[in-house]
């Protein structure tokens, strides 16, 4: 972060009290991304407390302005325009999700405002020659690598790959399919569903009918939770079930209880903030 500050210029807004550094971002506080994005907000607040406790960022107190993009791409675009042109933030904080980050990256690129993308993992974001966005997390295509390898180790021969029809889940699914092919596992079903889908009964029955022994679900908190609850209701069981985002969050086992047992998930770091 200090390197980004130095690259952003030496003169922060002189009208701010005591030469404060203003950070700003639009991060989902409501909508489908609120749960994982909330962990991102926690980490930002933790970092600010630690930095200010050490005397600030390069000697300047850090203050933050966090807005709610409501898990909506168009809202995020408008809010980042506002943060840059009206609020005149010194540094930008990245949004959550690959889809929103992909759209917002066009805004910060236009204004030459750098940010580190710590809540987006899809490779296409970094394949367009952009100069002002940086990645620090594993790429989406490798999220299910461990799950597919484990499936191979325990003798699974047929898997289903499902996921929300948005950028990150599609890329995670692409990676899972590639890993399955390398390991000689048969993908008997591939299907993406609308982002707000809540009823997975027909899809789960379709997966079972296809003969899948394991489910690679490229999902977020809400859809993964719904799939697991409905699996239990239908008494549909698989040798392995892996989800990209939901199981790695503390609220997942808290909300699902025993239904979350034996479910695989992914985490970028431990413990979660």
Regions found by a protein language model. Name each.
Residues 22-26, 63-66, 90-95, 113-119, ...:
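Structural recognition of the beta-strand scaffold that forms the well-ordered cores
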Residues 1-7:
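Bacterial N-terminal signal peptides
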Residues 51-58, 110-113, 180-186, 232-237, ...:
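Short helix-capping segments at alpha-helix termini
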Residues 78, 123-124, 131-235, 273:
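Extracellular/periplasmic Venus flytrap/periplasmic-binding protein
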Residues 32-42, 167-172:
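Glycine- and acidic-residue-enriched helix-capping/strand-helix junction motifs
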Residues 14-22, 35-42, 54-124, 136, ...:
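Beta-alpha junction/loop-to-helix N-cap segments that form part of ligand/metal-binding clefts
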Residues 228-273:
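Extracellular/periplasmic periplasmic-binding protein-like sensory domains
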């Amino acid at each position: 972060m200090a390197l980004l500050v130095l690259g952003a210029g030496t003169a922060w807004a002189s009208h701010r009290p005591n030469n404060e550094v203003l950070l700003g971002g639009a991060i989902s506080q409501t909508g489908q991304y609120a749960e994982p994005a909330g962990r991102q907000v926690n980490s930002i607040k933790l970092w600010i407390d630690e930095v200010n406790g050490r005397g600030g960022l390069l000697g300047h107190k850090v203050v933050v302005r966090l807005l709610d993009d409501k898990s909506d791409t168009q809202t995020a675009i408008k809010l980042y325009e506002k943060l840059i042109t009206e609020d005149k933030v010194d540094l930008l904080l990245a949004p959550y999700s690959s889809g929103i980050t992909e759209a917002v990256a066009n805004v910060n690129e236009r204004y030459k405002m750098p940010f580190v993308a710590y809540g987006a993992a899809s490779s296409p974001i970094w394949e367009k020659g952009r100069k002002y966005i940086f990645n620090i997390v594993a790429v989406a295509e490798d999220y299910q690598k461990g799950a597919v390898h484990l499936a191979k180790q325990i003798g699974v021969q047929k898997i289903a790959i499902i996921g929300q029809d948005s950028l990150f889940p599609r890329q995670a699914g692409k990676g899972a399919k590639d890993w399955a092919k390398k390991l000689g596992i048969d993908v008997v079903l591939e299907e993406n569903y609308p982002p707000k889908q809540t009823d997975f009964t027909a899809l789960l029955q379709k997966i079972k009918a296809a003969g899948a022994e394991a489910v690679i679900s490229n999902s977020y908190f809400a859809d993964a939770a719904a799939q697991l609850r409905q699996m239990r209701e239908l008494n549909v069981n698989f040798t392995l079930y892996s989800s990209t985002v939901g199981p790695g969050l503390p609220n997942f086992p808290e909300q699902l209880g025993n239904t979350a047992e034996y479910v695989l998930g992914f985490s970028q770091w431990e413990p979660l903030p």
